[in-house]
């Protein structure tokens, strides 16, 4: 038995969906532990492109249970659309479970999210506008609606009256937006509750029962390390904790239950939305990475900002997550480049530093110090084992592993499942040094 956490080691969009899908073959239970519909992952199965925001990738495997944990925030409208999409594609969703204590994104959360972002003007933080921040804010203020509340008419009416009155006051008086009607929300969300009721469980008890029965549990994070509310580039962050420690809180397990943490990182770096990005590229190479990597957000459709691999944030991710190994994705995107650069340190006000400054004002001033490596200028898309890779591609991977001081377990070379080199299965393989 092995319990593994999969986290993003950059600013999200690292390809966690594919890696989680790959590892789900060996997992009995997959748990999504934080975030909401602001995250998205794309999975390609038999030439079908499936885009999911809430449901774990493991849903594609018939014998794998998939839990949406207590640390998530659930938009039931979008969740039901995902369920319907999976059913239409012939996928069995009987293994889907939703924590009764997950908080619910309400219509006023989405409206307020968009209104507050518009009100920030030039100081916008790049929110997806999906209501995630306001939902987590209500959770912290103990004013939120939970999944269990959607299952009872009187309960929902009782818990929604005060927050709705407060939100309508904000909508009318601050933003000049028409207030929402209690009756309309009750009717809509009670219907959602009825449709979801058969999937609702005590998430923590379910996970601990699986652990007691020696099941393999995979904890799936959303977003990435640098978007963590406490350890990311605040305020340009999400409203939850994507780092590995968030798995314990969001799933309701102790740290001793976790056997291994695997970080997912692109062979280059991307960021969507606002905030400092030291290795960001401009011009033709940026366009090439964006086009070859199809760098457009699954959730927003926004074009992602692209840059060279940043070893400073990589080492930071290793530290705050306690990474045991790494999955490097989209190596094939670099195939046509004759030269590739990797950031090995920053210049901050004339001083060379090799640590990540979590103060966004300092990070804005950081200038990357690069190491240049030779490209391989041939396709890696059909490589299925390390020995198939061009020598310069191997050199590049070894350099990343040495820089981050963590072994590489998986290399992804395209969107399809089979475009992957698995050096070691992080669930079933022995815990040992791999590609260094």
UniProtKB/Swiss-Prot annotation:
Mg(2+) binds at residues 13, 40. InterPro entries: Adenylosuccin_syn_GTP-bd (IPR018220), Adenylosuccin_syn_Lys_AS (IPR033128), Adenylosuccinate_synth_dom1 (IPR042109), Adenylosuccinate_synth_dom2 (IPR042110), Adenylosuccinate_synth_dom3 (IPR042111), Adenylosuccinate_synthetase (IPR001114), P-loop_NTPase (IPR027417). The keyword Amino-acid biosynthesis does not apply. It comes from the Bacteria. GO terms for biological process: 'de novo' AMP biosynthetic process; IMP metabolic process. Its EC number is 6.3.4.4. Disulfide bonds: none annotated. Plays an important role in the de novo pathway of purine nucleotide biosynthesis. Catalyzes the first committed step in the biosynthesis of AMP from IMP. This is Adenylosuccinate synthetase. It comes from Prochlorococcus marinus (strain MIT 9215).
């Amino acid at each position: 038995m092995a319990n593994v956490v999969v986290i993003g080691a950059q600013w999200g969009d690292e390809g966690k969906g594919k890696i989680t899908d790959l590892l789900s073959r060996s997992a009995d239970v997959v748990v999504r532990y934080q975030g909401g519909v602001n995250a998205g992952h794309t999975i390609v199965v038999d030439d079908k492109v499936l885009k999911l925001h809430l449901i774990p990738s493991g849903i594609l495997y018939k014998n794998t249970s998939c839990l949406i944990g207590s640390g998530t925030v659930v938009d039931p409208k979008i969740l039901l659309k995902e369920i319907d999409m999976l059913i239409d594609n012939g996928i069995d969703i009987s293994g889907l479970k939703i924590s009764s204590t997950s908080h619910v994104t309400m219509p006023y959360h989405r409206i307020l999210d968009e209104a507050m972002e518009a009100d920030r003007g030039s100081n916008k933080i790049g929110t997806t506008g999906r209501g995630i921040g306001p939902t987590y804010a209500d959770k912290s203020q103990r004013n939120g609606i939970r999944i269990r509340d959607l299952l009872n008419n009187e309960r929902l009416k009782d818990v929604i009256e005060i927050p709705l009155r407060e939100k309508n006051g904000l909508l009318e008086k601050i933003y000049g937006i028409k207030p929402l009607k209690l009756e309309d929300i009750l009717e809509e969300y009670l219907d959602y509750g009825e449709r979801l009721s058969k999937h609702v469980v005590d998430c923590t008890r379910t996970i601990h029962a699986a652990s007691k029965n020696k099941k393999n549990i995979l904890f799936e994070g959303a977003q990435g390390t640098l978007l963590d509310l406490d350890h990311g580039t605040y305020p340009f962050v999400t409203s939850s904790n994507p780092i590995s420690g968030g798995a314990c809180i969001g799933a309701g397990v102790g740290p001793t239950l976790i056997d291994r943490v695997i970080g997912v990182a692109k062979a280059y770096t991307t960021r969507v939305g606002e905030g400092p990005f030291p290795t960001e590229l401009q011009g033709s190479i940026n366009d090439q990475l964006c086009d070859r990597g199809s760098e457009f957000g699954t959730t927003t459709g926004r074009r992602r900002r692209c840059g060279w691999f940043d070893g400073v944030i990589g080492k930071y991710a290793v530290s705050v997550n306690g990474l045991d190994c790494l999955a490097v994705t989209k190596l094939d995107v670099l195939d046509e480049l004759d030269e590739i650069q990797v950031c090995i340190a920053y210049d901050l006000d004339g001083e060379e530093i090799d640590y990540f400054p979590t103060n966004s004002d300092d990070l804005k001033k950081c200038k990357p110090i690069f190491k240049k490596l030779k490209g391989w200028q041939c396709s890696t898309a059909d490589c299925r084992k390390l020995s198939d890779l061009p020598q310069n591609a191997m050199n590049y991977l070894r350099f990343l592993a040495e820089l981050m001081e963590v072994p590489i377990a998986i290399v992804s070379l395209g969107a399809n499942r089979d475009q992957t080199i698995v050096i070691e299965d992080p669930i079933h393989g022995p815990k040992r040094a791999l590609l260094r």
